[in-house]
Amino acid sequence: MFNKHVKTFQYGNQTVTLETGEIARQAAAAVKVSMGDTVVLVAVTTNKEVKEGQDFFPLTVDYLERTYAAGKIPGGFFKREGKQSEKEILTSRLIDRPIRPLFPEGFYHDIQIVAMVVSVDPEIDSDIPAMLGASAALVLSGVPFAGPIGAARVGYVNGVYVLNPTKAELAKSQLDLVVAGTSKAVLMVESEAKILPEDVMLGAVVYGHDQMQVAINAINEFADEVNPELWDWKAPETNEELVAKVRGIAGETIKEAFKIRQKQARSAKLDEAWNAVKEALITEETDTLAANEIKGIFKHLEADVVRSQILDGQPRIDGRDTRTVRPLNIQTSVLPRTHGSALFTRGETQALAVATLGTSRDEQIIDALSGEYTDRFMLHYNFPPYSTGEVGRMGAPKRREIGHGRLAKRALLAVLPKPEDFSYTMRVVSEITESNGSSSMASVCGGCLSLLSAGVPLKAHVAGIAMGLILEGNKFAVLTDILGDEDHLGDMDFKVAGTTEGVTALQMDIKIQGITKEIMQIALAQAKEARLHILDQMKAAVAGPQELSAHAPRLFTMKINQDKIREVIGKGGETIRSITAETGTEINIAEDGTITIAATTQEAGDAAKKRIEQITAEVEVGKVYEGTVVKILDNNVGAIVSVMPGKDGLVHISQIAHERVRNVGDYLQVGQVVNVKALEVDDRGRVRLSIKALLDAPAREENAAE
């Protein structure tokens, strides 16, 4: 019934198994990948016909996590999985990025990849198995795909690279890097690091690429065994006559356009060139394929002009050489009521970054397959249509916005203060108000400045820069601080963020095969040069953390004995509610007895702290207290005196006065304030007090007989 094929190979410390032919047999190809107890099912479906009017490659990648994979039932009213989580979106992008450039130009058939996590080992992340499964399934589907690709996670523990580290190993690692590529070249890198030098980062990329060859070879052997039927697809031949026509109509106008330094004016000139081509060559009778071909030729002409100018040593689109960073303008504390803010402008790219401080109750609760955890630092990136001068729909953040926000967050994680040194929850929002290349790196710079503006004691300043590449044969040029057009028309998008000491985040997307270690080395060195230049200007604008905003909450931390937690909370929360209501504060108590008080003023925080200290204080034997009589005991036993909140003691009738007391009520009344001395605290915490001990003893009466 099943034509099942299985391939097993050793990958680092893990055994990987690829299976096909048993599940999802109606898909173009389906592969089940197992790594330890983590199992991912990847299915690829295709459309043999191109849709009418299709002028781009419609590749869709969806990575989905099922809660049953971890033995859980989803929360919420409907009890089923809903929209994709941030982890699912980021992993979908991780699969998409190295695969997309391996499809041939002019291939416009629908391809859908669905990677579904059906079992999860808490120690093994499902992203690497999902990437390997997508690679294998695409090869088995027979589509024109220049793969397979391999993927590897690289850690760095005690100066040694670790292949596919477990969750426990990652906790000790200075690096979390995912690299993907073919047998010949690296295509994608995504990483965060704890301020590592460039040579260590490059070494990790090379190490990961070397190690993934095992996976690539295994997928090739797997495909040879399955022997899939390949698509009979050929790239359309170049119509040289049509190319000449388009060049004749628009060639000179395109060259003139790329001499214009200002983006909007340049775009208008390019529109003029395209409109001339449309008028001359596209009519109502022109079919979609022909129109797409003309559009493709026009785009190629644009790329040829820009690329040839740069490789010939001519100035770039905006007049710069290959190493110059665009002019910078930095302003901090630009918004009066926010906790911290910065306006970071680099050329025609601008980010308004705003930092907000909160308490531990503001931490984001993340219900992941591996277990629930909280996140004290959030960075959200917004890219409104007006940032590029366009009209567009506003709505929920798109995958690109999620990805850019995550990259900026990873860049800043290494310099955040430890929770014990700075117990605030931090949120940064980066509003991209102008965009012409590298807005994610502007978010890194702006995010760092806004946190410093908010008074966050960062370990160091962090800046980011985007690098580009033009490669033709043996000639290449590495570009510093790329524009949007250079990103679209170039061969690489290489983003590096870090401090003066090293790299904190690295992201690389390569559109061609053939990027060498030498090119990556030059790009990293050039990026460091640019990063240090930006850092100098950032430090000149704000040298270190500023004073905490008057509008930010003040956090006061104190530690109490765990046995006292119940007393601070009170019966049904009565005590803690009264403290928060009376002082206007917010109080959070951890299981270990750490108390965090959030207050709008120093006075309110001090008042709440004093109340808690009074509740948790122990009565000291021999100490004098000012107390209040709260009860006169029956049978003339004595009185109960409250010496501090929640702490009462007994003044026995014999301890009220030196003379004989016949009636307690003759000496004490409820509500009366008296000074008492603590005589004893027994094993059960009961307190014995004395008023008499503080009174002068009466002089002895002389014998009357004398």
UniProtKB/Swiss-Prot annotation:
- List residues of the S1 motif domain: 622-692
Q: What does this protein do?
A: Involved in mRNA degradation. Catalyzes the phosphorolysis of single-stranded polyribonucleotides processively in the 3'- to 5'-direction.
HAMAP family linked = PNPase
A GO cellular component term found in this entry reads:
cytosol
Q: What family does this belong to?
A: Belongs to the polyribonucleotide nucleotidyltransferase family.
KH domain location is: 553-612
Superkingdom as given in the UniProt entry: Bacteria
Q: Which residues bind Mg(2+)?
A: D487, D493
- Pfam families referenced in this protein's UniProt entry, alphabetically: KH_1, PNPase, RNase_PH, RNase_PH_C, S1
Q: Which GO terms describe its molecular function?
A: 3'-5'-RNA exonuclease activity; magnesium ion binding; polyribonucleotide nucleotidyltransferase activity; RNA binding
EC number per UniProt: 2.7.7.8
- InterPro entries reported in the protein's UniProt record: ExoRNase_PH_dom1, ExoRNase_PH_dom2, ExoRNase_PH_dom2_sf, KH_dom, KH_dom_type_1, KH_dom_type_1_sf, NA-bd_OB-fold, PNPase
Which CDD domains does the record associate with it? KH-I_PNPase (cd02393), RNase_PH_PNPase_1 (cd11363), RNase_PH_PNPase_2 (cd11364), S1_PNPase (cd04472)
Q: Does the keyword tRNA processing apply?
A: no
UniProt keywords (A-Z) are: Cytoplasm, Magnesium, Metal-binding, Nucleotidyltransferase, RNA-binding, Transferase
Specify the enzyme's EC class, one word: transferase
Q: Does the keyword Cytoplasm apply?
A: yes
What is the protein name for this chain?
Polyribonucleotide nucleotidyltransferase
According to UniProt, the reaction catalysed is: RNA(n+1) + phosphate = RNA(n) + a ribonucleoside 5'-diphosphate
- Which organism is the protein's source? Neisseria meningitidis serogroup C / serotype 2a (strain ATCC 700532 / DSM 15464 / FAM18)
- Cofactor requirement: Mg(2+)
Q: Which BP terms from GO are recorded?
A: mRNA catabolic process; RNA processing
What is its subcellular localisation?
A: Cytoplasm
